[in-house]
Design a protein with these regions (language model features):
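A solvent-exposed interaction/effector surface
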Residues: 2-233
Length: 233
């Protein structure tokens, strides 16, 4: 007779996987202030690999993740093996970020981890928007390990994957656990925007969604963050 699979074993497995995910490198930051579940953070410059994909939030996340994972797992040309470069594997980092973009948008926004940031229009001086719902075009980012520079990173073989250095910025961050549906992400975004308005803190960019865990992580162990760039206090 088979012994039943105890729920505590399942929970322990989820904890183990969650801890393993958190062992990956993350961008360093300084916490400037903290109130409840909201932090104001200062991030130094770092490099991202990013791609633009179409679809709803879930479909775009999967497409973008696969494209950039393909790059870091070896679909590239090493910068260190000239004149006949081979491929090079790059360590996975966290978070992965996503941002929604307008159909003709060319502007690139920061990620901190997978994150989401909506752009109001293609114009570079367009106002920021707090809406993450109903977007059909997204930019997905992976943060590159800190050991690399733009010159030393392998060159993507896929022209849809681009490398970019993100300048130092200050962010308001709201963390939470669980699944990320579009309505839930919008709820958290609205909560963070309301807090910024109450504190009279100027937002400078569009909200982004940062996700730190692999998809098999149990919901209660998932680490998610909504991030909005702000004027440094």
């Amino acid at each position: 007779m088979k012994k039943p699979f105890h729920p505590l074993i399942f929970l322990a497995l989820g904890l183990l996987l969650g801890e393993h995910a958190m062992a990956t490198e993350e961008p360093k930051f300084e916490i400037l202030s903290q109130q409840g579940g909201i932090e104001l953070r200062r991030y130094p410059a770092f490099i991202v690999a990013e791609t633009t994909v179409e679809g709803d939030m879930d479909a775009a996340s999967n497409k973008g993740f696969r494209a950039i994972a393909d790059y870091i797992f070896g679909n590239n040309q090493s910068a260190l093996a000239a004149p006949s470069p081979g491929s090079e594997k790059i360590a996975m980092t966290a978070p992965v970020t996503m941002e929604p973009v307008a159909p003709a948008a060319q502007k690139i926004a920061m990620t901190a981890p997978v994150a989401i940031e909506p752009l109001a229009s293609a114009a570079t001086d367009a106002p920021a928007t707090s809406s993450l719902q109903n977007a059909k075009r997204w930019r997905v980012h992976f943060v590159m390990p800190s050991q690399y520079t733009l010159a030393s990173l392998p060159k993507p073989n896929n022209a849809a994957v681009q490398l970019r250095q993100v300048p130092a910025k200050t962010w308001a961050v709201l963390g939470y656990s669980g699944f990320n549906t579009e309505s839930r992400v919008q709820q958290k975004t609205d909560e963070l925007m309301a807090w910024l308005q109450a504190q009279k803190i100027q937002s400078l960019g569009n909200p982004q969604l940062a996700r730190y865990n692999p998809p098999w992580t149990l919901p209660m162990f998932r680490r998610n963050e909504v991030m909005i760039e702000i004027q440094q206090p």
